[in-house]
Every structure is written in structure tokens, then in C-alpha cells.
Design a protein with these regions (language model features):
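Hydrophobic alpha-helical targeting segments used for export or membrane insertion
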Residues: 10-11, 15
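N-terminal signal peptide c-region/cleavage motif recognized by signal peptidases
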Residues: 18-20
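Phosphate-end processing signature that detects enzymes handling 5′-triphosphorylated RNA
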Residues: 24-291
């Protein structure tokens, strides 16, 4: 009888421990990415040195916010790729309906079809399926200053670049929601090609998950200096698809810090890289890519 009582108490304790560590509901999303645009002119002459200064200033800001963890590691040059986004000039039906298409070549080579919306369930249930090889689909929370959306995307091997919406639907059957504009042509957004240089390395152990930091620089049409700089950190769900309360709380502190680094780093922005590119006024589209 005593043995049975002890075993029952032990089982109850283990169950309570499990509930305590996973008090939140399982998440729809695979990860959360927090991002902010910073002043690109700071990276014009020596990006590596500027990245180190940025990290030092960020750590100082976290200290003033009472962050109870630390950032370890340093930024080092990582993947370098050539990107292009595609939509229909003027009408921009993909962007207006929450979709985007991006090709990538270089250290990573693929094509991605993405749907973004503030409603988690709508984003989750929107079809973004692909028909290519090595498909990878994910649902991620994208957080920028003043905005939060759920991004549902599929990337796959890039075999061709779609020149019409109909061609896009063949690559990604999930794009059939755009069948009413299937004859529309697709061109590079803003008429430009982007060279993307990433710097990664810094991490912060925030509990059951790790925050991984990335600095991304965009160079337009082979320019020598970057036109865009983004600081971001990604937090993946734990092995059981949970984000614990301590992880979420510390993520919010990190988010507050990247949005208020100080020392002239932050610039007024609200939409992230893709929105920035759609608003970019190039020589090909001096009045803007979309009407």
C-alpha cells in the first residue's frame, strides 16, 4: 500500500512538472522572427566593424532594460545571395492580396512563395503548396515595429523563373487563388536585383529556446554600399512545439531593445525588407512600382 501511494505521488509530481514547463498551448508557428531596419549608411565603409559596434550598443541597451540573460558570440559574414521579387507592375496583385514571390541564387538557391496576414488561422490555412523538389513549408510570426503578421511560405528548388501568374501557379499550385489574374505578367519588383549579405553568430539562451541574431545588408543592382540594413533575431519553438512564458517574455525584451538601440541606429520604418523594396523608387520605376 505504501509503495502504491509513493508511486502515485511520484506520478502526480511528474505530471505537474510537465504542466508547469508547458503551461502554454502548442503553437501553430515553427518560429518567431523579430526584425527592425537600422541605418544602412553605418555599414558603408567597414560592415564588419559596424556590426561589432551595433552588437555592443545592443548589449548596452539590454543592460538598461534589465535583461537577465546575455548575448554571446560575434557577427561574421555568412551567406551571400542574389535575390529578386516578382509581381505585376502597376497593379501588384500579389502584394495587394498578401502574397510574394522571391528567387534566390548563390550560397542558397531556391524560389519561395509566401502568404502574410495578421490572422494566424487564415495564414495557417492558406494554401502555399509547391510542386517542385526539396519543398520546405513553414509558418512563422514576423514582428516589425508596429506590426505583426503570420508568414506561411514554401520554398523549393528553383528550376525556372515565372514570367506570368499562370506560370507561378504551375510551380506553386497554392497560387491558384490568383487564377483570376493568371494572364498577368510578372516582373522584378522595382526593376532591381538585390545582393543580400548576411552576418550571423550572436545568440542568446532565453530558456527553452535560443534567440539567433542576423544582420542583413541589401545592395541594389551591384552598388558598393548597402541601401538597406536589417537587424533581426529568430526564436524557434522548442522540441514539443511550445514557446514557454519565460521565452516569450525575454523575446519581448529583446524586441524592445532592437527597436530602441540608441546612438542613431534606428530609423523610422514599419514594414520590413519586402515592404521597403515595394516602396523603392528606382530609375526603372521613378514613381513607384505599384499604383
Amino acid at each position: 500500500m505504501m509503495k502504491r501511494t509513493v508511486l502515485s505521488l511520484l506520478s502526480a509530481t511528474l505530471m505537474l512538472g510537465s504542466v508547469a514547463s508547458h503551461a502554454n498551448s502548442p503553437a501553430y508557428v515553427d518560429s518567431k522572427e523579430y526584425k527592425v531596419l537600422v541605418d544602412p549608411t553605418r555599414f558603408a565603409s567597414n560592415p564588419s566593424s559596424a556590426a561589432a559596434t551595433l552588437l555592443t550598443n545592443l548589449s548596452a541597451r539590454l543592460s538598461t532594460l534589465g535583461f537577465d540573460k546575455t548575448i554571446t558570440g560575434n557577427f561574421a559574414a555568412g551567406d551571400r545571395d542574389t535575390l529578386a521579387y516578382y509581381d505585376t507592375p502597376g497593379t501588384c496583385p500579389l502584394n495587394k492580396r498578401g502574397y510574394s514571390v522571391r528567387t534566390r541564387a548563390g550560397d542558397d538557391t531556391d524560389i519561395q512563395f509566401k502568404f502574410r496576414h495578421a490572422d494566424e488561422e487564415l495564414s495557417y490555412w492558406t494554401d502555399v503548396s509547391g510542386a517542385g523538389k526539396n519543398k520546405e513549408t513553414k509558418l512563422e510570426t514576423d514582428v516589425t515595429p508596429g506590426n505583426l503578421v503570420l508568414a506561411h511560405s514554401t520554398k523549393q528548388d528553383a528550376t525556372t523563373t515565372p514570367t506570368t501568374v499562370a506560370a507561378l501557379i504551375k510551380l506553386f499550385p497554392g497560387a491558384s487563388a490568383l487564377s483570376d489574374v493568371s494572364t498577368s505578367s510578372l516582373s522584378k519588383v522595382a526593376g532591381v536585383t538585390v545582393t543580400q549579405q548576411e552576418y550571423d553568430g550572436p545568440v542568446s539562451d532565453i530558456g527553452e529556446s535560443v534567440a539567433e541574431f542576423t544582420l542583413t545588408l541589401w545592395y541594389i543592382d551591384g552598388a558598393a554600399t548597402p541601401a538597406l540594413a536589417e537587424l533581426s533575431f529568430r526564436v524557434g519553438a522548442d522540441a514539443d512545439k511550445y514557446f514557454t512564458t519565460p521565452v516569450l517574455t525575454r523575446s519581448q525584451t529583446l524586441n524592445a531593445a532592437i527597436g530602441s538601440i540608441g546612438n542613431g541606429w534606428n530609423i523610422a520604418n514599419d514594414g520590413g525588407k519586402t515592404s521597403w523594396l515595394y516602396a523603392y523608387r528606382s530609375s526603372s520605376y521613378p514613381n513607384g512600382f505599384c499604383n
